[in-house]
Amino acid sequence: MALKTRLGELLRPLNSQYGKVAPGWGTTPIMGIFMALFLLFLIIILQIYNSSLILENLDISWTTLGI
């Protein structure tokens, strides 16, 4: 016997769309935009890590991150 929870009842409408395909491109353009933004975020983090992005008056070192 399955346990019914409030969270399960809230998530049930999401599961009712299982297996259905949105017509046309659906949300693909939105996904592409978020992937591009995530790539930009990763590039900025990498540049900060490599110190190739110059941040004035901000000392970034592992010793300052320690507690």
Curated annotation (Swiss-Prot):
Ranges that cross the membrane: 29-49
GO BP annotations listed: photosynthesis; protein stabilization
Entry superkingdom: Eukaryota
Main location: plastid
Subcellular localization(s) per the UniProt record: Plastid, Chloroplast thylakoid membrane
SUPFAM superfamilies, alphabetized: Photosystem II 10 kDa phosphoprotein PsbH
Gene Ontology MF terms: phosphate ion binding
Alphabetical keyword list: Chloroplast, Membrane, Photosynthesis, Photosystem II, Plastid, Thylakoid, Transmembrane, Transmembrane helix
Gene3D superfamilies: Photosystem II reaction center protein H
Record membrane topology: Single-pass membrane protein
GO CC list: chloroplast thylakoid membrane; photosystem II
Record text on subunit structure and interactions: PSII is composed of 1 copy each of membrane proteins PsbA, PsbB, PsbC, PsbD, PsbE, PsbF, PsbH, PsbI, PsbJ, PsbK, PsbL, PsbM, PsbT, PsbY, PsbZ, Psb30/Ycf12, at least 3 peripheral proteins of the oxygen-evolving complex and a large number of cofactors. It forms dimeric complexes.
Family: Belongs to the PsbH family.
Record-linked PANTHER family: PHOTOSYSTEM II REACTION CENTER PROTEIN H
Purpose of the protein: One of the components of the core complex of photosystem II (PSII), required for its stability and/or assembly. PSII is a light-driven water:plastoquinone oxidoreductase that uses light energy to abstract electrons from H(2)O, generating O(2) and a proton gradient subsequently used for ATP formation. It consists of a core antenna complex that captures photons, and an electron transfer chain that converts photonic excitation into a charge separation.
Name of the molecule in the record: Photosystem II reaction center protein H
Lineage of origin: Eukaryota, Rhodophyta, Bangiophyceae, Cyanidiales, Cyanidiaceae
Name of encoding gene: psbH
